UniProtKB/Swiss-Prot annotation:
Source organism of this protein record: Drosophila melanogaster
PANTHER family the record matches: GUSTATORY AND ODORANT RECEPTOR 21A, INVERTEBRATE GUSTATORY RECEPTOR
Entry GO CC: axon; dendrite; membrane; neuronal cell body; plasma membrane
Role according to the record: Gustatory and odorant receptor which mediates acceptance or avoidance behavior, depending on its substrates. Gr21a and Gr63a together are sufficient for carbon dioxide detection and avoidance behavior. It is possible that the CO(2) receptors Gr63a and Gr21a activate the TRPC channels through Galpha49B and Plc21C. This innate olfactory avoidance behavior can be inhibited by inhibitory interactions of the odors such as 1-hexanol and 2,3-butanedione with Gr21a and Gr63a.
Membrane-spanning intervals of the chain: 115-135, 154-174, 207-227, 238-258, 313-333, 346-366, 423-443
Protein name per Swiss-Prot or TrEMBL: Gustatory and odorant receptor 21a
Positions in the Cytoplasmic compartment: 1-114, 175-206, 259-312, 367-422
């Protein structure tokens, strides 16, 4: 209280009046949150000074080095998705490896001198040899062929652009191997931390057969698409398909990887939500809610790490889909206008539906994962009856809601783009704009030719 306040109070009391009340400062939401955090941390220090504090209240407890054997025991996500990781190693796409169970050594690692990388280099060299032969053959045939029709140019542009994705593999995939290893270790540590906190493991139902099915389906779909192009295009030789089999299969496997991880994020969020609901019904759940808040933040960080680890690969993925879809759609419509529908246009539409299907799966699964981890989890928190719990629990629920607001579970490609349903609509609108402009040029050119002939 200032000197002026004391003077006014003395003057009011001496005359039998009520002294003026203390002016309460007006705080904005950020200042109020900071003040409440400081008050709660001071309460924590007082509890610690009296020796009756709970170690996990308010602050994240210090991380400890876990037993690698225990990590392996509870790493059900690795065990159920191991088939896809092994397939990536065989194809030379992502040569990460499992480290021996030693202390202070991450369970998943990446080393340029490992046997997995050496195998990837060997496979990549063999595959690149075939790609170069096919690329040279297609370019030579296109340049020397007397048939310069537009549909021939469209087909060559599409399939040559697909071949170039092979040359981007070391830069887009191998270079980010350490980030992928970090992401895999985050999953391993998260599952064990979840078990220690809740007392029950995360169960991924049907993930093992689903992963195996996707591995087989990825290659079967690649074979089917390439053989369809072989039968629908007279100039597409059978040996060309051997260059495209691993490329299309790689695109399918990356789509499968994205689907599996998004599905696993939703499963982990649902398991955490169920454990939280059970804890809320117990006595004094504030201590556990602090750990649940840390688990949720870790889950949100894992979603962000997925996009960071595969940012270049999925960025290239989206660009290939965008470019191929525009060229194939324009080529098919243009040829139908000029010469009518043929089997070649059917082949172009197969490519269009394939590319748009991949983009839809990636964006739709990312949308569902973000909703399950974010909105659905937040909705369950808001439905908690806070009047039936103590003050510490109420505060922990509020802090968990703040954590969700401050760490939105967004699937982001390292800042390049957010993967959600909006990306689908944006791509479709861009493609429609480009197609309208290109078709306007096409119609104008036809009118000019018609006027000249008349």
């Amino acid at each position: 209280m200032t000197f002026l306040d004391r003077t006014m109070s003395f003057w009011a009391v001496s005359r039998g009046l009520t002294p003026p009340s203390k002016v309460v400062p007006m705080l904005n939401p950020n200042q109020r949150q900071f003040l409440e955090d400081e008050v709660r941390y001071r309460e924590k220090l007082k509890l610690m000074a009296r020796g009756d504090a709970m170690e996990e209240v308010y602050v994240r407890k210090q991380e400890t080095v876990d037993d690698p054997l225990e990590l392996d025991k509870h790493d059900s996500f690795y065990q159920t998705t191991k088939s896809l990781l092994v397939l990536f190693q065989i194809m030379g796409v992502m040569p990460i490896h499992r480290n021996p169970p030693e202390k202070n050594l991450p369970r998943t690692g990446y080393s340029w001198g490992s046997k997995q990388v050496m195998w990837a280099i060997f496979i990549y060299s063999c595959q690149t040899t075939i790609v170069v032969l096919v690329l040279r053959e297609r370019v030579k045939k296109f340049v020397t062929s007397p048939d310069k029709r537009f549909d021939e140019a469209i087909y060559n542009v599409i399939f040559i652009s697909l071949l170039f994705t092979n040359f981007l593999l070391p830069v887009a995939s191998w270079r980010h191997g350490p980030q992928v290893a970090i992401f895999k270790n985050m999953w391993t540590n998260y599952q064990y931390k979840f078990f220690k906190t809740t007392g029950s493991p995360i169960v991924f139902p049907n993930l093992y057969p689903l992963t195996w099915s996707l591995c087989v389906f990825s290659w079967l779909l690649s074979i089917a698409i390439n053989l369809s192009q072989y039968f629908l295009q007279p100039d597409f030789r059978l040996w060309y398909t051997f260059a495209y089999y691993p490329i299309i299969a790689m695109l399918n496997c990356f789509c499968s990887l994205w689907y599996i991880n998004c599905n696993a994020f939703g499963t982990a969020s649902r398991a955490l939500s169920d454990a939280l609901q059970t804890t809320i019904r117990g006595e004094k759940p504030a201590q556990k809610l602090t750990e649940y808040r840390h688990l949720w933040v870790d889950l949100s960080h894992m979603m962000q790490q997925l996009g960071r680890a595969y940012s270049n690969m999925y960025g290239m993925y989206c660009l290939v889909i965008f470019f191929t879809t525009i060229i194939a759609t324009y080529g098919s419509i243009s040829e139908i206008i000029d010469h009518g529908a043929t089997y070649k246009e059917v082949g172009l539409f197969v490519i269009v539906f394939y590319c748009m299907g991949l983009l839809y799966i990636i964006c739709n699964e990312a949308h569902y994962a973000s909703r399950k981890v974010g909105l659905d989890f937040q909705t369950k928190l808001l439905n908690i009856n806070l009047t039936a719990v103590d003050a510490a629990t109420q505060k922990e629920v509020e802090m968990l809601l703040v954590a969700i607001n401050k760490n939105p579970p967004i699937m982001n490609l390292d800042g390049y783009a957010n993967i959600n349903r909006e990306l689908i609509t944006t791509n479709i609108s861009f493609m429609a704009t480009y197609l309208v402009v290109l078709l306007q040029f096409k119609i104008t050119e036809q009118r000019r030719i018609g006027q000249q002939q008349a």
